[in-house]
């Protein structure tokens, strides 16, 4: 859900900023505040939804029942303890350096995109900067995997029709683009590609790990990360 929201957030933020500039007359330096305002309102709404519907998932929340016996854990050997500490250190190293780089996405990399990348797309490339085209590609990927994973013939048929329809629509849109067509690309739009790859490649990675698991070669969690 986070990555789906991150996929649409750049386009939404740019659209709100443009609306504030064109309709309300705000300068570029002030109009972006409206995008943050909408994000803040969405966060407040999500918290309200969480507490309003908390009763629907309270049964899966943590906590021990009254009178429940305490769980006695086995003592680990020094070798087992060492293995777990090494695994934790590997995870910590990956997580620390990943987030050090990832958190540059909202500021440093956006500055880089604004100042050092081409902000105009031409021809077929214009499709890649339309978030709806990326969303359709994701639908096509999941529908294609569903063809092989569905247990019923009806499910396979529906998935096949959906994947074929989406791909046909994308081809139709691509054929309607003139070679000299061009669009201006705002720097924040480049942020939509990371969540796109995360969502689109999730079934691919799951299929790979599932295949390895069947062969008894599934990598450990640190190796997956």
Where are each of the predicted segments found?
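Extended hydrophobic secondary-structure segments that form protein cores and membrane-embedded regions
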Residues: 1, 34-39, 223-225
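Hydrophobic alpha-helical transmembrane segments of integral membrane proteins
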Residues: 6-7, 199
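Intracellular loop-helix junctions on the cytosolic face of multi-pass helical membrane proteins
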Residues: 14-183, 205, 209-215
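C-terminal substrate/ligand-recognition segments
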Residues: 158-160, 186-225
């Amino acid at each position: 859900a986070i990555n789906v929201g991150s996929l649409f957030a750049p386009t939404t933020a740019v659209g709100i900023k443009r609306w504030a500039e064109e309709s309300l007359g705000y300068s570029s330096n002030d109009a972006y505040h409206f995008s943050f305002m909408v994000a803040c309102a969405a966060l407040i709404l999500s918290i309200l939804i969480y507490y309003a519907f908390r009763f629907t998932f309270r049964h899966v929340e943590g906590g021990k029942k009254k009178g429940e016996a305490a769980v006695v854990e086995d003592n680990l050997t020094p070798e087992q303890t060492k293995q777990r500490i090494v695994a934790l250190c590997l995870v910590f190293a990956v997580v620390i350096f990943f987030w050090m780089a990832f958190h540059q996405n909202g500021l440093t990399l956006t500055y880089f995109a604004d100042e050092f990348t081409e902000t105009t797309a031409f021809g077929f490339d214009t499709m890649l900067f339309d978030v709806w085209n990326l969303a359709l590609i994701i639908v096509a990927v999941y529908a294609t995997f569903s063809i092989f994973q569905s247990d019923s013939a009806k499910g396979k048929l529906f998935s096949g029709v959906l994947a074929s329809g989406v791909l046909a629509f994308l081809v139709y849109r691509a054929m309607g683009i003139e070679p000299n067509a061009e669009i201006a690309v705002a720097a924040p739009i480049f942020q939509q590609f990371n969540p796109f790859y995360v969502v689109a490649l999730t079934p691919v990675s799951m299929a790979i790990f599932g295949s390895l698991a069947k062969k008894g070669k599934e990598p450990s969690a640190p190796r997956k990360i």
